Amino acid sequence: MTARGIGNSAGPAGECQAVARFHGHREAEGRGLDLPDRLLALAALLLLAAGAWFIGDAAWMKGKAVLAQVLIQRAWAANLDGAKPRERPWSWADTTPVGRLEFVRQRRSMIVLAGDAGRVLAFGPGHRPGSALPGKPGNSVISAHRDTHFAILEGARIGDLVRVENIEGQTLTYRIDALDVVDEHDLSVTEQRGIDQLTLVTCWPFNALAPGGPWRYIVTASRQQDRL
C-alpha cells in the first residue's frame, strides 16, 4: 500500500488500521513460497547450475582442442621449414608438431604432437614415445580423444586411405586393414612387426558418458605404394 493510502485514514485509529493493513500486506509478501516450495525451487536452481557447468565445461574442452589447432598449424609450418629447435605452438608448451594426418574419404586433416600424455591429447593427436615417428619406417602409434580429434574413427572403414606427412614434408599413404576393440592393457598393438604401419588409438565406446574406460578402439593401416 502506498503512503497516500495511509494518509487517507482519519485520526489515530485510522492510522493504526492502515499500518496494520500495511504490515499484513508485507507479511503476506514475505510468506511467498512455503518451505517445501522454496526447497524445490532451490533444488531446481542447483540442477540448472550443475547442468550449465557440465555443458560449459564440455564445450570448453572441445573448443580448446579445435582452437589450439590454429597455433599448432603455425608451429607445424615452421617445423616444415626446418625450424631449429623445433617450434612449439605456444611458449609454455612441452610438445611440438611431428606429423600431419589426412583422412582422405572424410576430407579431414590434423596435426600430430609429440607425446601422448593427457596434457598433449587435450590439444590434438599425440605420438606415442618409442614408436616410429609418423611417416617413418615401423609402427607409428598415435592416440587422441574419442570426443574430439579421433571422433572421426567411429566412421572409419576397411579400405579407407590415410595420408601421413612427416617432418621432412614427405607424404606417405596408408590403407586401413583392421578395426579392433582391445583391453586398455593390451600393448600388442604398439609392437614393432618389421612392417611400416600406422596404429590409431582412442577410447571405446564412442558414446560413453564417462571418460576413459577399459576398452580401446584400434585402427590399423599399412603403408601403400605411393600411387596417388
PLM regions and their residue ranges:
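N-terminal Lys/Arg-rich, disordered targeting/topogenic segments
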Residues: M1-L35
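Solvent-exposed, non-transmembrane regions of membrane-associated and secreted proteins
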Residues: V19, H25, P36-L228
